[in-house]
A protein has these predicted regions:
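Alpha-helical membrane-targeting segments
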Residues: 1-25, 48, 52
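HotDog/MaoC-like acyl-thioester-processing domains
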Residues: 3-5, 100, 110-160
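Short structured motifs
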Residues: 25-31, 89-95, 117-119
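Short connector loops at helix/strand junctions that flank enzyme active sites
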Residues: 26, 36, 64, 68, ...
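Catalytic strand-loop segment that frames the active site of acyl-thioester-processing enzymes
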Residues: 26-56
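Residues located in well-ordered beta-strands
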Residues: 30, 92-94, 106-108, 135, ...
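Hot-dog-fold acyl-thioester-processing enzymes
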Residues: 44, 48-70, 82-83
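Hydrophobic beta-strand-centered segment that forms part of the acyl-chain substrate-binding groove
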Residues: 72-112
Length: 160
């Protein structure tokens, strides 16, 4: 994905977060990569996001997982042109290491989200669900070694 596209996606994400979910705007997310198949969001380790141990606060890690998994679903819904209601049904987290740097949150299930949106459109009034996995890494310190893993169930329903 081009740097310009990522910049546009970041601007869109931050504007949406500022208008609808200000807490997410507060952590200053950046879109690192966004395609039909995957989404990678970076949240910087800063005074806003760190805890007393100088690692990323677990609430911010959860917000990053929300962003990576949710942004994929939100963009797929927008591209469909239909009014689909989107909520998280459940959320499971496994914290593996301290996140002592900027954290990258990756979701590789964009195509599954596109299929889920289509299932919601094809079954009006019925709630459809799909589990998505998000992996958090700190490339500057640990490379591809995960610092946390998240499983979120996304639930969609065609509005109307």
């Amino acid at each position: 994905m081009s740097a310009l596209t990522n910049l546009k996606e970041t601007a869109f994400l931050r504007a949406f977060a500022f208008a609808k979910i200000p807490l997410l705007a507060w952590v200053r997310p950046t879109v690192v990569d966004f395609t039909a198949a995957r989404c990678e969001i970076r949240i910087p380790l800063s005074r806003r996001t760190r805890n007393h141990l100088w690692s990323m606060y677990f609430g911010v890690l959860c917000a990053g997982a929300d962003l990576a998994g949710g942004y994929v679903a939100m963009r797929q819904i927008q591209q469909s042109g239909h009014k689909v209601v989107f909520v998280f049904k459940d959320f499971h987290a496994e914290f593996l290491k301290r996140a002592e740097g900027d954290v990258h949150f990756s979701c590789e299930q964009g195509l599954a989200m596109a299929a889920l949106v289509q299932r919601a459109i094809d079954a009006p009034g019925t709630r459809v669900e799909e589990a998505v996995a998000v992996v958090a890494t700190v490339p500057s310190r640990l490379g591809d070694t995960p610092v946390a893993r998240f499983d979120l169930t996304i639930s969609l329903k065609l509005k109307g």
